[in-house]
Amino acid sequence: MALWGWRGVGRRPTFFVFASLAPIGRDFLRRNGDDARMMGHLEKLLAPTLDAMGYEVVRVTLLGSQNPTLQVMAERLDGVAMTVSDCETISRALGALLDVEDPIAGRYSLEISSPGIDRPLTRPKDYARFAGHEARIETDRLIEGHRRMKGLLLGIDEDRTVRLRLIEGKAAEDGTLPEVEIPFGAIVKAKLLLTDALIAKALKDAEALADEGEAAGGAVEGGVA
């Protein structure tokens, strides 16, 4: 087993990589079946461990087949920014779990990352959390004549319909841009666009968490005194 670690700067995510030295087996996809189904299985397998540690799965992705890399994107439940130390902690815990469960045939690497500012949108709650920010969405079918759309997120309805105001395209006579409704299940890929507003939100959230931490520390010190 080998470990590597490095930290990104600014918008770039933080990574920590764990490499398993298991012998190379048959082609991963042929042995384990459908990629999407396998990722769903792995997410369900990993989620309880992460939750118990104070983290949450954002996305599980597989790259490659002969020597696959399993990428696990995670975030802290308390909202604090991920660090290399967090990624290392997750890597060791999930590495041990995967060694026991052995869901992957052959040699593989486990890569842990944080979402970054211009993060992927993978869960229904992400569309509510980042309403008011711009995103790029790709679907598996035509939606209002589009499969790739860029627009302002307006939120998500109870029936899991994502609402998006397009920022590209022909405006109506009153100057408003068209709005589209996208079934969550039709979304293949979605990601926030890096904008000044998104960066400002990230900085504001970080400052708020820092203030909360200082306030909590002051309260504890006052209680001890």
From Swiss-Prot:
One GO CC annotation: cytosol
Family: Belongs to the RimP family.
Keyword Cytoplasm among UniProt keywords: yes
InterPro entries per UniProt: Ribosome_maturation_RimP (IPR003728), RimP_C (IPR028998), RimP_C_sf (IPR036847), RimP_N (IPR028989), RimP_N_sf (IPR035956)
UniProt-listed HAMAP family: RimP
Main location: cytoplasm
Primary gene name: rimP
Subcellular location: Cytoplasm
A biological process from GO: ribosomal small subunit assembly
Pfam families: DUF150_C, RimP_N
Organism of this sequence: Rhodospirillum rubrum (strain ATCC 11170 / ATH 1.1.1 / DSM 467 / LMG 4362 / NCIMB 8255 / S1)
Protein name: Ribosome maturation factor RimP
